[in-house]
Amino acid sequence: MKKLIFSFFLCGATMFPAFSQTYQELSERAVAATEQDSLSLAEKYIEQALKMEPANPHNALLFSNLGTIQRRQHRYEQALDSYTLALNIAPRAIPALMNRAALYLELGKDDLARIDYSLVLDIESDNQEALLMRAYIYMRQRNYNFAKSDYERLLKLAPQSYNGRLGLATLEQKEGKYEAALSILNAMIAEKGGEATRLTTQQYAVLYVARAGVEQDMKHVDLAMMDLEEAIKLDASQTEAYLIRGQIYLSQK
């Protein structure tokens, strides 16, 4: 859910004739260095390009890329500053808005993240990632009606969205609508092995854990234990499965 968006600056000189070749070369070298995980070198190239043409409107791309580099280095405040500088130049740049929103969310600044995702949706109303992430924030903030609205909008655009369906099932569970939650999860699990969906074993394990959580809430502990066993069989790294199983064991003492 927290994907980095890196705006690659690979446009040719014919597309942007105003660029000097050196500016273009520095930008391309920054991309190449980033792809090779030479982040400090990439940052150096970007800073040189910015100094060379400080008024260039396409510096928005460079600032956005710089923010992503800084984020990968865990220099979060500097990354926020870079994303904001990008948006000062290009306020409607969706990649920069998405990057900043994801970083705000990572830092626990949910309201600021929600604002940026909302700005994205004002520009591009069918942006599926923005809908998904805003729904997630609304759910965390217990704004369940708004969360449901976003999940439903997302599922109209992408009916088979794994994260959208799982998110809606989680929302139904939080509202105590256990049968509705089970209906969604049962349908997703029943599709296992079908041509319509190609999920990983880890994704299926998450579904079994999610269903076990609903069954636990419904006091159907035997069913929950069966689903937890299946989840662990599919993916032994499912921490949540062990936690729920431990809770069930404790409740039976």
Functional labels for PLM-detected ranges:
Residues Y23-Q24, P57-L61, I94-P95, Q128-E129, ...:
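Helix-start (N-cap) detector for alpha-helical repeat units in TPR-like alpha-solenoids
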Residues L10, A18-N65, R72-E77, D81:
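N-terminal leader/linker segments that initiate helical-solenoid repeat arrays
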